[in-house]
Amino acid sequence: MSKVIGIDLGTTNSCVAVYERGESKVIPNKEGKNTTPSVVAFTDKGEVLVGDSAKRQAVTNPEKTIYSIKRIMGLMINEDAAKEAKNRLPYHITERNGACAIEIAGKIYTPQEISAKVLMKLKEDAEAFLGESVTDAVITVPAYFNDAQRKATKEAGTIAGLNVLRIINEPTSAALAYGLDKKDSEKIVVYDLGGGTFDVTVLETGDNVVEVLATGGNAFLGGDDFDNKLIDFLANEFKDETGIDLKNDVMALQRLKEAAENAKKELSSANETEINLPFITADASGPKHLVKKLTRAKFEGMIDSLVAETITKINEVVSDAGLKKDEIKEIVMVGGSTRVPLVQEEVKKAFNKDLNKSVNPDEVVAIGAAIQGAVIKGDVKDVLLLDVTPLSLGIETLGGVMTKIIEKGTTIPTKKEQVFSTAEDNQSAVTINVLQGEREFSRDNKSLGNFNLEGIPPAPRGMPQIEVTFDIDANGILTVSAKDKATGKAQEIKITGSSGLSEEEINNMVKDAELHKEEDKKRKEAVDARNAADSLAHQVEKSLSELGEKVAAADKENIQKALDDLRETLKNQNASKEEIESKMKALSEVSHKLAENMYKKDEPNTANDKKKKDDDVIDAEVE
């Protein structure tokens, strides 16, 4: 069995790890870094850039550079979070089958397809590092991700050519990495604040058991929101000073985003920073520059309400676990946004305890995922991971009420049944509307999908017995079935429609990804050939210049013609590897012929010189 990789598919950055020779370690990408920006860009030349190369060109290509795609993963277009994303992100968010999608140059891409491109890069980097093909993976998601978001994440893995063995929660994964070697039982809190999501989880670890006691969070709160507060502040200040709204200029907005992100990072270690963006825009009076000093205190004032929200969630989750704060042994900080000093101060104050910073907040989740992969494969034995469902699951019943079948905090995998009946006399069919959430009424919760159970025999209301079964697998993905106990008729739904993609669409995307992988490979080969051709042309031109009159006129003409042909081919940006190599071969042949002729031309002179030297030698003996 090949190695299993663990992937932390993050909002801002992603990370991949592997378990080998008794330890889990992070795999560096081809650029030599341990994390890869979760950024995908489409260039005007038709190239698809992923990671650092995509992030570097974001300012000049904002509408075709996709970042924070995780924020709309598994979202329907009419959800509030989708509307917020549309207002915030520079690229065009649209819909496909009612679910969020993006439009680039007239083509529709789902969040799954964009995430798949990030996953494909991580897969390729892992294969290059390990020297073998990799298909099996464990991918992490925020603990508070709902069924649709989990399903969409798994689909992204499938499109990327991965066999997703398990979807596990990020804080659980972090706890696995942290607590695997702990022999004594201890209760810990994992506070996970990433780029786009927040989770807090209470776990019990020890003796190779990691058990989730309670979890909660916000799938739409993270470092991006800290950045957005700062972007709003800078844009509003600039508008007050100049009357120009930078939010209407996507290129300026992208520069603001980068500046905000950098300022946030600088203020984690400094008390003051300067944001300096020359030529941010222009009006009739000339170019405008944005220069603003920002103190840490000012920044903390902008984000304090967001941090306070995370502290409120801590209190709820510790209470849900049936614990008091003084029973918590360790607070493990996970996610890049936990580097913000205010976050650390407030969490420390909440527990009146020093924080555990022994783990790398950017890498620990991937490391834990790799351990889980090794558990599934059998390389790590006697480790038990007991996770829970973050939200209650149920169905809509009479009066638009949500009736819960599986309560939040239930250990998964799990299976539960409940018997319902009809609401009207002689009702021949029932519609099962599957819901996820904590509110009392159906309309306030998320509908995951619905299906009909038909062919119920005529009977007075309340008489038929319809057994509804909810089955959650180890990935936290739900299957619901309904059965009429009198007739045995049954209907089942695996919640697939919630992600907006059918099985056929996913298969098509897998094929499309493979096709583009081949296209990308050909494009890379063409780039390599182009670089080699440039090098050859330069070398030949240099040799011609150095040899000057020593080159025969006919040879010079042939070489120049081959050079011109090669240069002309290189002007065509769509020239294939084969076309370039053909012209290179022609140039190599005439330049090699030239070298041979030059050698032959010099050879007789060498012989004559030798003869002349020999003539000067006196044949005599020396005493």
Curated annotation (Swiss-Prot):
Triggers of expression: By stress conditions e.g. heat shock.
Ranges in coiled-coil conformation: none
Lineage: Bacteria, Pseudomonadati, Campylobacterota, Epsilonproteobacteria, Campylobacterales
Keyword Chaperone belongs to the record: yes
Protein keywords: ATP-binding, Chaperone, Nucleotide-binding, Phosphoprotein, Stress response
Start-end of Basic and acidic residues biased regions: 595-615
Name of the gene: dnaK
Name of this protein: Chaperone protein DnaK
PANTHER family named in the record: HEAT SHOCK PROTEIN 70KDA
NCBIfam families to which the protein is assigned, alphabetical: PRK00290.1 (NF001413), PRK05183.1 (NF003520), prok_dnaK (TIGR02350)
Record region (Disordered): 595-623
Family under the similarity heading: Belongs to the heat shock protein 70 family.
Modified residues (Phosphothreonine): 197
UniProt cross-references to Gene3D superfamilies, sorted A to Z: 1.20.1270.10, 3.30.420.40, Actin, Chain A, domain 4, Substrate Binding Domain Of DNAk, Chain A, domain 1
GO molecular function: ATP binding; ATP-dependent protein folding chaperone; unfolded protein binding
Role this protein plays: Acts as a chaperone.
Native source species: Campylobacter jejuni subsp. jejuni serotype O:2 (strain ATCC 700819 / NCTC 11168)
